[in-house]
Amino acid sequence: PPNIQLTILVGNYAQHYYLHQKSSTKLTDTVKHYRDYLPDYFPLVHPSPRNNIWQAKNPWFKKELLPDLKELVQKILSQ
């Protein structure tokens, strides 16, 4: 069987489906509380140029979330 250690959930649809969320759950809230879904899931915004405004309004994304994601992926790949 595959050794899946992390599932990255990109965007609202994936997050609502895998996290069994109500459709009213806001993407920003889910992504901001990404630690609540670890170690199995890591919710992210879609990497689209249209999200540049969202990223500008949410500086924690680049300051906290991305370094945590990089560290986690490096840890998994080094095993």
Give the predicted meaning of each segment.
Residues 1-79:
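Glycine/proline-rich loop-helix segments at beta-alpha junctions forming the active-site rim
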